[in-house]
Amino acid sequence: MSRVSVPCHVKGTVALQVGDVRTSQGRPGVLVIDVTFPSVAPFELQEIMFKNYYTAFLSIRVRQHTSTHTPAKWVTCLRDYCLMPDPHSEEGAQEYVSLFKHQMLCDMARVLELRLILRQPSPLWLSFTVEELQIYQQGPKSPSMTFPKWLSHPVPCEQPAPLIEGLPDPNRVSSEVQQMWALTEMIRASHTSTRIGRFDVDGCYDLNLLSYT
């Protein structure tokens, strides 16, 4: 299935403080990133791709177009997706990630806006985010190939033409010719190579035969 990149605008991150903001131990453990699509009509999202940078868990909310009389609502489509198996180790910290619509908790049609919620509970990393964010929708379908009518609807097996009255059966004639050819080959193989004289009978000449020549 082909895909097409959707132009988007990624807003700056908003940090939610975890801990006491009056002490040095307080640090942002949650970041929020809003993604808008100002030049695109509501679309069906197929894939989200990005490079992780020390984000341990990811949640995504989507705002979808419903109708002209109903305001669009935010719906959670991905909840606490694990990007780092152990937030305190490097595994998965800088991996490329692809998320597809079948992994989402809701239908991804008529998308207006996305909100990415990033969490990193470990105090070991000074910063975390996601980079190189790309949004994709389904591309145009490939034009269907047309085939000739004779290829789409094969002609049934042809029936042998009826025999013309008065003519011999060609199959029978072919069989008889084959037999005659085989008989000729047998005679040729068994023919003696000794030359017999025209008037020679047992090594002598017959006078009667000679008189008629």
From Swiss-Prot:
Keywords, sorted A to Z: Microtubule, Nucleus
S-S bonds: none
GO CC terms of this entry: microtubule; nucleoplasm
Superkingdom per UniProt: Eukaryota
InterPro entries on file: Nicolin-1
Principal localisation: nucleus
Subcellular location: Nucleus
UniProt cross-references to PANTHER family, sorted A to Z: NICOLIN 1, NICOLIN-1
Quaternary structure annotation from Swiss-Prot or TrEMBL: Part of the neuronal tubulin polyglutamylase complex which contains TPGS1, TPGS2, TTLL1, LRRC49 and NICN1.
Name used for this protein in its record: Nicolin-1
